[in-house]
Amino acid sequence: MWQLNENQVYLPPPTPVATIVSTDEYVQRTSLYYHAGSARLLTIGHPYFELKKPNGDISVPKVSGHQYRVFRVRLPDPNKFGLSDTSLFNSETQRLVWACVGVEVGRGQPLGVGVSGHPYFNKDEDVENSSAYGTGPGQDSRENVAMDYKQTQLCMLGCTPPIGEYWGKGTPCNASRVTLGDCPVLELKTEVIQDGDMVDTGFGAMDFASLQANKSDVPLDLCTSISKYPDYLGMAAEPYGNSLFFFLRREQMFVRHFFNRAGTTGDSVPTDLYITGTSGRTPIAGSIYYSTPSGSLVTSDSQIFNKPLWIQKAQGHNNGICFGNQLFVTVVDTTRSTNLTLCAATQSPTPTPYNNSNFKEYLRHGEEFDLQFIFQLCVITLNAEVMTYIHAMDPTLLEDWNFKIAPPASASLEDTYRFLTNKAIACQRDAPPKVREDPYKKYKFWDVNLTERFSSQLDQFPLGRKFLMQAGVRAGPRFKSRKRPAPSSSSSSKPVTPKRKKTKR
């Protein structure tokens, strides 16, 4: 009896898979370098939450030292530059791009440790040095608790937005069997890191708003937020290497206190793990243990900012080429997270004796940044192979360079009407061209416009002088000397008269 072979046959892909190559394969670097720097970038707000007006508009934003700062740096189009050397590239077959070869992220303000907390923090017992066995949390055992967070310094650079990961609420296989009080299912999610997102503070990277219903398990600045951690694995595996040229990271944390949570323990301790206690030890105490983090000492010896960073070789295939004339600089610095306490009197003049009710206390947090870059001008020769490769990576790049890929010829029969203004037929006018939207319009970034801040005079800027020094290049003199040249030895001496030759008579 004949039987069908059940082994699957795998066919090759219909078209060959393009090999991802480094940008060094098709980008030629020139000897022209430019400096670009931002103005002093300042932001200030409330460190725990945003303040809103009665109509819902934000009056004071949330500005915390434990937020990501994602700068979207916009660069000028080098193809529209007025270059003195017209033989640098052929505008018919070549295009110019920027390569970032140096960056320095400057941070202002003094070092300091910020404190966060919750006036209704879910703290049941001190399980590190307990004086008595727990007798139960009662109806409401929340307390006013504050702490300092994990210490993080981070700098990431790429030409597309960074990607973060966190644990979120997933979808169960059988939603009909889920009842109230069941443990939520978890799912690892990845999203774009936006400006203002919270970093990992020591309580894990997770969606606290969806996974903690009591809003009391973490401090105020986290209880309704999502804490994201950079997806280093995902960005390192990106084929073209656009999202992460390099990163510089420093993290440290230790545990300060050990507590347990109040509330019914969802996963009871199995009875085979303990022997039932006597009076005073029943019922068993809560076993949801947790710790409060601390970042410990902050010192200038461990700073990664206010230092030049040179890009010799990126970790991915993109070796610092700024496709789309933009850069994304992601910064985290919790070593300058001091919260400013402000006080205002409610009466004038200030009454005496002192009374707490005569003063209002406020919290604010301010941050100061400065971005400096060194860019190198590069040339891309657009032959058929390179154009096909770039089109597969990002088709909008060729559109920005006024190149288009011709669509394949259509084999279907098209309709063509004779009288285009005939009222008996539908309108035959061509649809207006669609305006291309910003692909990152729905994300929130800190825009930094450097289109008019480029300069080829590198020695006029601190980062430019550092670049010239490490490259072994010395700037020439700008002013010609006005001193007269010293006279030569022959001209300074007295003129010598030749002696008369004696002649015989």
UniProtKB/Swiss-Prot annotation:
<dbReference type="Pfam" id="PF00500">
    <property type="entry name" value="Late_protein_L1"/>
</dbReference>
<keyword id="KW-1015">Disulfide bond</keyword>
<comment type="subunit">
    <text>Self-assembles into homopentamers. The capsid has an icosahedral symmetry and consists of 72 capsomers, with each capsomer being a pentamer of L1. Interacts with the minor capsid protein L2; this interaction is necessary for viral genome encapsidation. Interacts with protein E2; this interaction enhances E2-dependent replication and transcription activation.</text>
</comment>
<comment type="similarity">
    <text>Belongs to the papillomaviridae L1 protein family.</text>
</comment>
<keyword id="KW-0426">Late protein</keyword>
<protein>
    <recommendedName>
        <fullName>Major capsid protein L1</fullName>
    </recommendedName>
</protein>
<dbReference type="InterPro" id="IPR011222">
    <property type="entry name" value="dsDNA_vir_gr_I_capsid"/>
</dbReference>
<dbReference type="InterPro" id="IPR036973">
    <property type="entry name" value="Capsid_L1_sf_Papillomavir"/>
</dbReference>
<keyword id="KW-0946">Virion</keyword>
<keyword id="KW-1048">Host nucleus</keyword>
<dbReference type="GO" id="GO:0005198">
    <property type="term" value="F:structural molecule activity"/>
</dbReference>
<keyword id="KW-1145">T=7 icosahedral capsid protein</keyword>
<keyword id="KW-1164">Virus endocytosis by host</keyword>
<dbReference type="GO" id="GO:0039620">
    <property type="term" value="C:T=7 icosahedral viral capsid"/>
</dbReference>
<keyword id="KW-0945">Host-virus interaction</keyword>
<feature type="compositionally biased region" description="Low complexity">
    <location>
        <begin position="486"/>
        <end position="496"/>
    </location>
</feature>
<keyword id="KW-1160">Virus entry into host cell</keyword>
<keyword id="KW-1162">Viral penetration into host cytoplasm</keyword>
<keyword id="KW-0167">Capsid protein</keyword>
<dbReference type="GO" id="GO:0019062">
    <property type="term" value="P:virion attachment to host cell"/>
</dbReference>
<comment type="function">
    <text>Forms an icosahedral capsid with a T=7 symmetry and a 50 nm diameter. The capsid is composed of 72 pentamers linked to each other by disulfide bonds and associated with L2 proteins. Binds to heparan sulfate proteoglycans on cell surface of basal layer keratinocytes to provide initial virion attachment. This binding mediates a conformational change in the virus capsid that facilitates efficient infection. The virion enters the host cell via endocytosis. During virus trafficking, L1 protein dissociates from the viral DNA and the genomic DNA is released to the host nucleus.</text>
</comment>
<dbReference type="GO" id="GO:0075509">
    <property type="term" value="P:endocytosis involved in viral entry into host cell"/>
</dbReference>
<dbReference type="InterPro" id="IPR002210">
    <property type="entry name" value="Capsid_L1_Papillomavir"/>
</dbReference>
<feature type="region of interest" description="Disordered">
    <location>
        <begin position="474"/>
        <end position="505"/>
    </location>
</feature>
<dbReference type="GO" id="GO:0042025">
    <property type="term" value="C:host cell nucleus"/>
</dbReference>
<keyword id="KW-1161">Viral attachment to host cell</keyword>
